[in-house]
Amino acid sequence: MGHEEALRNVPLFAGLEPSDLQRLGRILVPRQYEAGEVIINEGDEAVGFFVLSSGKVRVVKDLGGNREQILATLTPGEFFGETALLDGYPRTASVQAVDKTECLALTRWDFISELKGSPTMTVEIVRALARRLRQTDATLSE
């Protein structure tokens, strides 16, 4: 059966057909992380896309001099890791588990393949990126 039930509750996948959810459910890999464990390191090459299925993570930017800025706290149903997969540049921030966390991971190859084959998913990714850009603009103008 895979992870289709969990995927139905993820806004990114809400508009997908049941057959698309089944396919995604078969290729997503569950990954568990303990509190404090780093999932993505800023500056690393992008190898995956993650959907948060349980727990909580924080997205952190290194400001240098042993300082950091928390950019976001993500909860189940949200996703991360897409930016570096799309633009091919290194990761722009680190992602760390706040508490015991499970993510469903999609490899770079599968992520790109899904975007090419699913206009609905592509549009939802673009919408999510636009929302994040709008939030960043609002934060910077405060």
Question: Positions of the model-derived regions?
Answer:
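Cytosolic regulatory regions built on CNB/CRP/Popeye-like sensor folds
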Residues: 1-142
